[in-house]
């Protein structure tokens, strides 16, 4: 059975387990020992969608429970990865050692994801999972819109809804949904329940430590993000940039040392909407790393030409380079 690989963006990104193994064999200098199918090694800075379902011998019409969690909400570097995982309601996950991904060592997380990817064992047969990696560029593009800013909570909500919809579209009969909350849990639960009335929705804090299916989703998200970030680091051949969080001295030092005074950072891996990055580029009084640029606006003087439409202005003052219009 073939897993589905699509890009959330127009260009299709395709990878599979065999190509992942070949890439690792070819790159002997890589520190990556396991490349999950949810990571697009050839373009790790791009948004990417991945879906793997249960095996054909597992009935899709039986009741399923589904969990949702994310990784990388707070860092200034890399993608935010949302993951859903699902299994039959009567399949017991408790014996496999799932826990909140943040409480597990990285090697343990990778071992568990390897088990899930292996369709020859009972866990791999009964578990389906999907990830959506939202690139740093896409996150920043939404948050830096001139009008109708697309904040992180809305992006998270929409991604969660899209991922769950795709599971239903694949034929899985989801009857229980468990979500680690983003924002107030009550209003978020009501929102999801309205979208998915056929299931019982539970949204709560610390869901990743309360429900094994959310813990499983947490592992899928965390391993995907960690390896995707390392692939990005290797692709631009840069030194260790730490955890990617602004509180990490290695990360902030990397940002300061590697910023271009005009173009920012290479690799599309920095979230330009984060204060740490914005301060280095937009506040010369606080940082000497940037060059202040005066953007000339179009003349808004009214004319008598009522038939010619004004061409929209690209939001070029946004440093990350995404071409959206206002």
UniProtKB/Swiss-Prot annotation:
Its EC number is 3.1.26.4. GO terms for cellular component: nucleus; ribonuclease H2 complex. Residues 15-47 have a biased composition (Polar residues). It catalyses: Endonucleolytic cleavage to 5'-phosphomonoester. Keywords: Endonuclease, Hydrolase, Metal-binding, Nuclease. It is an enzyme of class 3 (hydrolase). Residues 1-47 are annotated as: Disordered. GO terms for biological process: DNA replication, removal of RNA primer; mismatch repair; mismatch repair involved in maintenance of fidelity involved in DNA-dependent DNA replication; nuclear DNA replication; ribonucleotide excision repair; RNA catabolic process. Manganese or magnesium. Binds 1 divalent metal ion per monomer in the absence of substrate. May bind a second metal ion after substrate binding. Pfam families: RNase_HII. InterPro entries: RNase_H2_suA (IPR004649), RNase_HII/HIII (IPR001352), RNase_HII/HIII_dom (IPR024567), RNase_HII_hlx-loop-hlx_cap_dom (IPR023160), RNaseH-like_sf (IPR012337), RNaseH_sf (IPR036397). One of its GO terms (molecular function) is metal ion binding. It comes from the Eukaryota. A divalent metal cation binds at residues 69-70, 180. Its cofactor is Mn(2+); Mg(2+). PROSITE patterns: RNASE_H_2. Residues 63-286 form the RNase H type-2 domain. PANTHER family: RIBONUCLEASE H2 SUBUNIT A. Endonuclease that specifically degrades the RNA of RNA-DNA hybrids. Participates in DNA replication. Belongs to the RNase HII family. Eukaryotic subfamily. This is Ribonuclease H2 subunit A. The lineage of its organism: Eukaryota, Fungi, Dikarya, Ascomycota, Taphrinomycotina.
């Amino acid at each position: 059975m073939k897993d589905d690989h699509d890009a959330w963006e127009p260009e299709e990104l395709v990878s599979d387990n065999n190509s992942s193994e070949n890439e690792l064999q070819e790159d002997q200098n890589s520190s990556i020992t396991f490349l999950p199918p949810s990571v697009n090694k050839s373009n790790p800075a791009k948004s990417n969608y991945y879906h793997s379902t249960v095996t054909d011998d597992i009935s899709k019409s039986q009741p399923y429970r589904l969990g949702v969690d994310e990784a990388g909400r707070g860092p200034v570097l890399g993608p935010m990865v949302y993951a859903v995982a699902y299994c039959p309601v009567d399949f017991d996950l408790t014996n496999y050692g799932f826990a909140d991904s943040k409480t597990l060592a990285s090697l343990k997380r990778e071992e568990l994801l390897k088990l899930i990817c292996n369709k020859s064992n009972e866990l791999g047969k009964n578990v389906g999972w999907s990830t959506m990696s939202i690139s740093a560029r896409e996150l920043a593009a939404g948050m830096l819109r001139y009008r109708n800013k697309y904040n992180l909570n809305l992006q998270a909500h929409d991604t969660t809804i899209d991922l769950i919809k795709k599971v239903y579209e694949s034929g899985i009969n989801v009857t229980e949904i468990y979500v680690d909350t983003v924002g107030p849990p009550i209003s978020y639960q009501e929102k999801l329940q309205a979208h998915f009335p056929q299931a019982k929705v539970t949204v709560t804090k610390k869901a990743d430590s309360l429900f094994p299916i959310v813990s499983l989703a947490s592992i899928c998200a965390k391993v995907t993000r960690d390896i995707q970030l390392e692939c990005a680091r290797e692709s631009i051949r840069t030194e260790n940039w730490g955890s990617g969080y602004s509180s990490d001295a290695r990360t902030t030092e990397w940002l300061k040392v590697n910023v271009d005074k005009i173009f920012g950072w290479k690799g599309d891996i920095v979230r330009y909407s984060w204060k740490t990055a914005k301060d280095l580029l937009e506040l010369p009084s606080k940082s000497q790393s940037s060059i202040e640029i005066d953007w000339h606006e179009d003349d808004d003087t009214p004319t008598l030409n009522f038939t010619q439409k004004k061409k929209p202005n690209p939001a070029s003052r946004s440093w990350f380079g995404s071409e959206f219009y206002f």
